């Protein structure tokens, strides 16, 4: 199979097709206007990375054209030898260029792939008609990041977090009490902790946040870290294709330059569903400027494409004198966020049903612990690969029961 991709800045329009047919393509031809030269170079690097990850051998050719020059377009056709195994991947491209190449390829018995990012489906068009297909090979977060020529520098290990659920449920049952316990730990009011908050303190000891003497074992404000884990444990019950926690991404230089984002960004929770990326920001307390948090999320989200979405989760302290009478994300801020595909969960306590409703409406997911099952299977496989004897195998089975 020969895949001819028209390269342009909106990568989400064509990387799903590249991934869908990665195992069938033996040759990529990247066609691009001279103004998109850098994007073509980045995509070539990204496909080479993908080939390395999946041990693929596809060749890559690049073809620069001036889409405003008719003679240049006609000359370009001489470098494309169309067969019945040639497919054009041109969603989102310049219309004139797409029509020109589509006509040429169809006339020579090739095919055109028309990808619909909203439905994550595509049509295979021939000169005799078309057939509709759904994308079958869904990208993981790693795949998506690879095809954007970015790098995940680090991420948290989610598997151990699954064992923290009971402790976190107890801590977030009453957020006001959690804030008060935090204040007492900072003051080292041992008697008050022993008398009124011993069960919550025990949960923090189990999570290795404090020691048995109620001294901090972690640096900084641990409330945000706890919220991140707690939200993660609520998210994994839904049918996302992949989830990452505390992931730091190093973005490619083109995205840094064009989207005005930082070279590196840390995401509390990253998710992907049907090849569309999203993220969740977890914040405890009040920020200096809530609208700035919305604008920051929007600027980062632009990188993930127009169908990316995010949620900001903010749990406030009901005893904070600055915001006792109102929440910091007022209706005007929520409306502005909604226009940018950002949902807001802002309250004094955590209502699981309300959060799940927001999660479903934002990311179009349903409750099904697909990712949790995959995580357990991967953990078991990793364990199984380490052991060979019958005794060791039985130990693996025991481990699986404990997950």
Each predicted region: which residue ranges?
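Short, acidic/small-residue loops that bind anionic groups at enzyme active sites
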Residues: 86-90, 105-126
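N-terminal beta-strand-loop-alpha-helix module at the start
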Residues: 1-49
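A charged nuclease-like catalytic/ligand-binding cleft shared by nucleic-acid processing domains
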Residues: 28-83
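Intrinsically disordered, low-complexity Ser/Thr/Pro/Gly-rich regulatory segments
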Residues: 140-403
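Short Gly/Thr/Asp-enriched flexible loops that form oxyanion-binding sites at enzyme active sites
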Residues: 93, 97-109, 333
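Structural motif
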Residues: 5-10, 32-35, 90-92, 284, ...
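Short, aromatic/basic amphipathic alpha-helical patches
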Residues: 17-21, 39-53, 101-103, 322-340
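Short beta->alpha junction loops
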Residues: 6-9, 59-73, 283-286, 347-350
């Amino acid at each position: 199979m020969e895949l001819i991709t028209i390269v342009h800045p909106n990568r989400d329009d064509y990387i799903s097709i590249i991934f869908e047919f990665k195992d069938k393509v033996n040759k990529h031809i990247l066609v691009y206007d001279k103004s998109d030269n850098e994007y073509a170079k980045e995509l070539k690097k990204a496909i080479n990375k993908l080939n390395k990850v999946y041990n693929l051998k596809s060749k890559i050719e690049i073809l620069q054209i001036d889409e405003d020059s008719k003679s240049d377009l006609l000359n370009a056709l001489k470098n494309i030898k169309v067969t019945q195994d040639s497919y054009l991947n041109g969603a989102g491209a310049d219309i004139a260029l797409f029509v020109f190449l589509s006509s040429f390829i169809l006339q020579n018995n090739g095919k055109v792939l028309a990808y619909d990012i909203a439905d994550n489906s595509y049509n295979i068009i021939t000169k005799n008609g078309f057939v509709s297909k759904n994308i079958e090979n869904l990208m993981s977060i790693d795949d998506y990041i690879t095809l954007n020529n970015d790098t995940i520098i680090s991420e948290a290990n989610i598997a151990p977090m699954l064992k923290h659920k009971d402790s976190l449920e107890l801590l977030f049952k009453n957020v006001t009490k959690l804030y008060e316990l935090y204040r007492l730990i900072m003051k080292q009011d041992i008697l008050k902790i022993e008398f009124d908050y011993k069960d919550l303190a025990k949960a923090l000891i189990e999570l290795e946040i404090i020691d048995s003497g109620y001294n901090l074992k972690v640096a900084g404000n641990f409330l945000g870290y706890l919220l991140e884990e707690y939200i993660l444990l609520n998210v994994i019950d839904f049918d996302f294709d992949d989830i990452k926690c505390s992931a730091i991404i190093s973005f490619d230089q083109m995205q840094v330059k064009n989207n005005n984002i930082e070279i590196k960004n840390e995401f509390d929770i990253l998710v992907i569903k049907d090849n569309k990326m999203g993220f969740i920001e977890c914040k405890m307390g009040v920020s200096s400027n809530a609208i700035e948090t919305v604008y920051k999320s929007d600027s980062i989200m632009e990188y993930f494409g127009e169908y990316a979405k995010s949620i900001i989760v903010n749990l406030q302290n009901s005893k904070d004198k600055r915001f006792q009478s109102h929440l910091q994300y007022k209706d005007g801020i929520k409306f502005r966020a909604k226009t940018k595909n950002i949902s807001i969960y802002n309250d004094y306590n955590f209502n699981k049903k309300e959060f799940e409703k927001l999660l479903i409406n934002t990311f179009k997911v349903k409750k099904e612990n697909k990712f949790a099952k995959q995580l357990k299977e991967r953990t078991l496989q990793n364990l199984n690969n380490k052991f060979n004897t019958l005794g060791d195998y039985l130990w693996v089975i025991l481990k699986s029961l404990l997950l």
